[in-house]
Amino acid sequence: MNREGAPGKSPEEMYIQQKVRVLLMLRKMGSNLTASEEEFLRTYAGVVNSQLSQLPPHSIDQGAEDVVMAFSRSETEDRRQ
């Protein structure tokens, strides 16, 4: 996760955004989230909705590492634009 931050966002906002993205990727890959993780996503439903469209598509054959790497690449490309 990028700890340098983004302009206009507090470290807490960045943490929430990153955690939402990771949990959504895990859910999309078929992982069962814990009750506290599901509650976190419900609590930050607005962030969840904005992040869903940003998740990279993945094949069921792709491993978790490949999906995370693809997501990291897309994040890097977004920041360069």
UniProtKB/Swiss-Prot annotation:
GO terms for biological process: anterior/posterior pattern specification; branching involved in ureteric bud morphogenesis; negative regulation of canonical Wnt signaling pathway; negative regulation of mesenchymal cell proliferation; negative regulation of protein binding; negative regulation of protein-containing complex assembly; negative regulation of smooth muscle cell proliferation; negative regulation of transcription by RNA polymerase II. InterPro entries: ICAT_dom, ICAT_sf. It comes from the Eukaryota. GO terms for molecular function: armadillo repeat domain binding; beta-catenin binding; transcription coactivator binding; transcription regulator inhibitor activity. It is found in: Cytoplasm; Nucleus. SUPFAM superfamilies: beta-catenin-interacting protein ICAT (SSF81730). Keywords: Cytoplasm, Nucleus, Phosphoprotein, Wnt signaling pathway. GO terms for cellular component: beta-catenin destruction complex; beta-catenin-ICAT complex; cytoplasm; cytosol; nucleoplasm; nucleus. Its main location: cytoplasm. The modification Phosphoserine is found at S59. Prevents the interaction between CTNNB1 and TCF family members, and acts as a negative regulator of the Wnt signaling pathway. Binds CTNNB1. PANTHER family: BETA-CATENIN-INTERACTING PROTEIN 1. Belongs to the CTNNBIP1 family. This is Beta-catenin-interacting protein 1. The lineage of its organism: Eukaryota, Metazoa, Chordata, Craniata, Vertebrata.
